[in-house]
């Protein structure tokens, strides 16, 4: 049996990962198993999640650039596939995975590795590398391999992990806030930040918990439309319905005719991205538990990695980019106190619907990033302070 500082490391799914659990200073309005009532309140909280966790728009364009693909229909089709798979993966994680309020979506690390594979070996090799990488990740979760790293994690690590993830979230927020440096966008960002602060700390109940949604709708949609910077043309041009299908890019001009190929170099290169995503997920699970005031248990690692792997295998079949846990959603939980996994399941359903309705997806894309970034700064700060206190 493995022993470390007097602890027994025989496998026990209910065993806490850390001997000393952090005390969260976050006021939880809805716990993991709570269901906000009435139903429309849960739907609004879910919509709030989708307003922040919509980065497939960035990763799809980045992937196309790395892959050297410039066909006009490629990015819109990839966007729909990513949202569709994002919904499946999120619902899978919150239902049969670790059952934490975690959103699964495309990540920069996996996007970069898969984009490089596409540039050298073509899209069929990307789906092959994604499928094998997801299979290996699933096996790692089923065999409980990843959870064994807990023997190297002393209790003091939990606060450091949560704080580090808070800094990552803050970096994302700052990048979004200053993604457009024209004076008008910076003023919108400042207005968004101040309005979000007022709603969060000077109001109570539904308004305080929904400060992200309210701020983004008022400033990001209404005010931006009035100022003429919300891109409604892309929304009007997008179709209402687009049905996802298996291997949607087969026969794409300039790409190999094969549906899927398995190339050793592509698989190895792709799995390097998967390994980074796996260890990032382990940290995200710790931060999520800290934000939810939930004990971080061994089962959260194993079931989470297994569900993430299964989700990546599904994305390979539908032509989406591999999915991993999203740091942004931890910030939403920490800032709003809404830790209900039912809300996150509803968000998964909304992402699924975005995959069927490109017009709705483009409405999200039209919201100026500085508005989203300014609001998300508050969420990132909540994560950092939670980690420092623990």
Model-found features: residue ranges?
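Flexible hinge motifs at transmembrane-helix junctions and intramembrane kinks/re-entrant loops
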Residues: 8, 13-14, 67, 71-74, ...
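Interfacial segments of multi-pass membrane proteins
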Residues: 114-119, 329-344, 349-355
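Hydrophobic alpha-helical transmembrane segments of multi-pass membrane proteins
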Residues: 47-51, 153, 157, 182, ...
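Membrane-embedded alpha-helical modules
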Residues: 119-231, 348-390
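Core transmembrane alpha-helical segments of multi-pass membrane transporters/permeases
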Residues: 42-62, 258-283
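Short, non-helical or kinked segments that cap or interrupt transmembrane helices
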Residues: 98-110, 151-158, 208-211, 320-329, ...
């Amino acid at each position: 049996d493995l022993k470390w500082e007097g602890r027994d490391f025989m496998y026990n799914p209910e065993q806490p990962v850390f001997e000393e659990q952090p005390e969260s200073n976050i006021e939880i309005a809805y716990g993991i198993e709570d269901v906000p009532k009435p139903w429309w309140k849960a739907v609004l909280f879910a919509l709030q999640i989708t307003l922040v966790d919509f980065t497939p728009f960035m990763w799809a364009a980045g992937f196309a650039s790395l892959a050297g693909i410039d066909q006009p229909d490629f990015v819109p089709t990839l966007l729909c596939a990513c949202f569709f798979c994002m919904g499946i993966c999120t619902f899978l994680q919150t239902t049969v995975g670790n059952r934490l309020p975690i959103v699964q979506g495309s990540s920069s690390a996996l996007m970069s590795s898969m984009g490089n594979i596409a540039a050298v070996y073509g899209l069929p090799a990307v789906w092959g590398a994604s499928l094998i990488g997801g299979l290996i990740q699933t096996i790692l979760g089923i065999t409980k391999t990843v959870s064994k790293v807990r023997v190297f994690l002393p209790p003091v690590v939990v606060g450091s992990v949560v704080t580090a993830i808070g800094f990552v979230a803050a970096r994302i927020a700052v990048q979004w806030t200053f993604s457009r440096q024209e004076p008008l966008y910076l003023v919108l960002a400042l207005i968004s930040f101040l309005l979000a602060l007022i709603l969060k700390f000077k109001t109570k109940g539904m308004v305080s918990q929904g400060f992200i949604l309210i701020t983004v709708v008022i400033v990001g949609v209404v005010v931006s439309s009035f100022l003429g910077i919300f891109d409604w043309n892309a929304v009007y041009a997008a179709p209402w319905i687009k049905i996802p299908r298996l291997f949607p890019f087969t026969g794409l001009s300039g790409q190999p005719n094969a549906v899927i190929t398995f190339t050793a170099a592509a698989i190895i290169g792709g799995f390097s991205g998967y390994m980074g995503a796996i260890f990032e997920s382990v940290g995200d699970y710790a931060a999520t538990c800290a934000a939810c005031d939930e004990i971080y248990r061994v089962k959260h690692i194993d079931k989470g990695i297994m569900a993430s792997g299964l989700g990546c295998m599904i994305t390979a079949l539908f032509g989406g980019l591999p999915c991993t846990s999203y740091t942004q959603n931890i910030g939403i939980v920490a800032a709003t106190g809404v830790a209900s996994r039912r809300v996150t399941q509803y968000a998964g359903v909304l992402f699924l619907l975005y995959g069927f309705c490109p017009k709705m997806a483009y409405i999200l894309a039209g919201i100026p990033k500085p508005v989203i970034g300014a609001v998300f700064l508050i969420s990132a700060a909540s994560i950092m302070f939670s980690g420092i206190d623990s």
